[in-house]
């Protein structure tokens, strides 16, 4: 039976604004996820809940230096956690907390798994691990065992929450197609990617992510081999402990888009030109202003021509190519035997060369229909539809952030959920960038989408984003929250930060409370799993 939060009656001695605020507070405190906070009706006292450690640094909007300050005095694993990107994106094969615990325990050796944090995070992790131990205050609970600790080598580990078997904790998924979603005139190339799962043991739920082990661009690989003076067919020992040809290593195993500091140090040590060697060393040590910034391996080989390391030495120093995660855009109840993704193909100019995103262009350009691609499912523990099918949901997902909400709507339709659905979507131009327009328009017409608000930033002189549409609908948003609505955000970190600020301002204004109280209200919703984010 669904839980219905109490509502302040209209004849109660409160103003309309006071009633709205109280209704919202009651819905947040006593709603479906918060009912456990209500006073127990049993005479016997409830057992005291186990203390849960707070992580004040676990916020991607907080700067790295401030995150480290907030973790001062904590156990080493907590300091390591504070150095990470705080996105819990799973690209490292862990969550931020469990990756830090694995590093602290020694079960994980690689410092470069935090893809969003990049070299900045890796360098801080290295400093923290190499620093002498200092007195810390203990964690309030024992750290969870690092996932896959019983396996030897990070490449062989199977991470907690992954579904899949075989090499690198994966199972083969058959690539089917990558249809372009943008129309003519768009500046973007967004693909609707479909994998067939009928010959694999991969199974997913809405809210999960799909991990893809992509291959590096063949043209980039051949250019690197040529600059190194190597032979693609020669066998090398790979950084993941395997042995294969140089071409295969640079294509499937090594991260050549983001050379590790260790690889840059190898180049520095093998550059007879003193100026080049010093500049490479500055890059490896992360000195501000060291050039070229954000260079891939070919950039470095072109910029520092005297650096000619032995091929095996360089390959051993490169990092392992990490999988890329994509929010799943389908419900298995609606598209049996398939998984759908929404992928923005990344292409840009850098250092005088055309650059490509590793996984996005692999899916958009190079994956062949029917090809088996190593893949896995990353379980979502904190991005799930409410179990109460009558609960309303508000989804905010511009651009490719709309992917999980396409899945949510398919799921709600499949299970016959009666709760109202509200989608905020935005992109550049309506004529060319309204992703899944026909589907969402049909859902709006037939009532599955009770509300559909659109923000196309470049269709008018002033830029308009989803947070502007949210402010225009402030009163109704507050009303939905007062009725127990669940909030979901998916998309880029900067967008999520702006939306979070807009939500706090809306709640403060409509609820007649301070901004600080509004942020506390949002934090309460998050604790009750009524405010969930999938941010990258």
Language-model features: locations:
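Short, charged low-complexity linear segments at domain edges
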Residues: 57-78, 120-121, 125
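Short beta-alpha connecting loops at secondary-structure transitions
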Residues: 65-67, 84, 107-111, 423-426, ...
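Local cysteine-cluster metal-coordination motifs and their immediate loop/turn environment
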Residues: 84-102, 111-127
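C-terminal accessory/binding modules appended to enzymatic or scaffolding proteins
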Residues: 67-79, 83-88, 174-176
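Amphipathic alpha-helical packing elements
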Residues: 80-87, 99, 204-205, 210, ...
């Amino acid at each position: 039976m669904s839980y219905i939060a109490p509502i302040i009656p209209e004849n109660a001695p409160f103003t309309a604004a006071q009633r709205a605020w109280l209704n919202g507070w009651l819905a947040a405190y006593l709603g479906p996820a918060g009912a456990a906070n209500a006073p127990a009706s049993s005479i016997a006292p409830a057992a005291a809940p186990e203390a849960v450690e707070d992580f004040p640094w676990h916020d991607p909007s907080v700067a790295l230096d401030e995150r480290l300050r907030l973790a001062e005095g904590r156990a080493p694993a907590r300091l390591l956690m504070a150095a990470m990107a705080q996105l819990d994106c799973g690209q490292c094969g862990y969550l931020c907390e469990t990756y830090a615990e694995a590093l602290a325990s020694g079960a994980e050796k690689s410092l470069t798994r935090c893809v969003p944090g990049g070299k900045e995070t890796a360098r801080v992790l290295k400093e923290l691990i190499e620093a002498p131990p200092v007195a810390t205050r203990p964690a309030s609970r024992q750290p969870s065992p690092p996932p896959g600790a019983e396996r030897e080598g990070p490449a062989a580990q199977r991470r907690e929450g992954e579904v899949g078997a075989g090499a690198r904790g994966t199972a083969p998924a058959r690539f089917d197609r990558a249809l372009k979603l943008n129309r003519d005139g768009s500046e973007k190339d967004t693909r609707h990617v479909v994998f067939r799962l009928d010959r694999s043991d991969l199974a997913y739920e809405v809210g999960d992510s799909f991990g893809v082990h992509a291959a590096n661009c063949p043209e980039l690989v051949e250019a690197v081999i040529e600059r190194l003076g190597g032979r693609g067919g020669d066998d090398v020992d790979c950084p993941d402990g395997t042995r294969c040809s140089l071409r295969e290593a640079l294509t499937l195993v090594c991260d050549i888009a983001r050379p590790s500091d260790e690889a840059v140090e190898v180049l520095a040590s093998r550059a007879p030109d003193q100026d080049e060697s010093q500049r490479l060393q500055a890059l490896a040590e992360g000195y501000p202003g060291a050039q070229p910034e954000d260079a891939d391996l070919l950039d470095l080989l072109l910029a520092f021509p005297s650096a000619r390391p032995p091929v095996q030495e360089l390959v051993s120093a490169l990092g392992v190519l990490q999988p890329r995660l994509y929010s799943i855009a389908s419900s298995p109840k609606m598209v049996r035997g398939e998984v759908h993704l929404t992928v923005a193909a990344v292409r840009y100019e850098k250092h005088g060369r055309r650059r490509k995103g590793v996984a996005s262009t692999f899916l958009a350009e190079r994956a062949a229909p029917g090809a088996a691609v190593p893949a896995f499912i990353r379980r979502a523990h904190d991005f799930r539809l409410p179990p109460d099918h009558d609960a309303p949901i508000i989804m905010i997902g511009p651009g490719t952030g709309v992917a999980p909400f396409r899945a949510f709507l398919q799921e709600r339709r499949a299970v016959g959920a009666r709760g109202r659905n509200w989608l905020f979507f935005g992109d550049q131009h309506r004529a060319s960038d309204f992703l899944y327009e026909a589907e969402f328009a049909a859902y709006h017409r037939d009532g599955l989408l009770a509300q559909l608000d659109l923000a196309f930033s470049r269709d008018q002189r002033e830029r308009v984003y989803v947070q502007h549409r949210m402010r225009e609908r402030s009163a109704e948003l507050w009303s939905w929250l007062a009725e127990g609505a669940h909030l979901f955000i998916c998309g880029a970190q900067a967008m999520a930060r702006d939306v979070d600020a807009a939500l706090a301002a809306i709640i403060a204004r409509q609820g007649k409370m301070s901004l600080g109280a509004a942020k506390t209200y949002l934090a309460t919703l998050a604790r009750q799993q009524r405010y969930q984010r999938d941010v990258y």
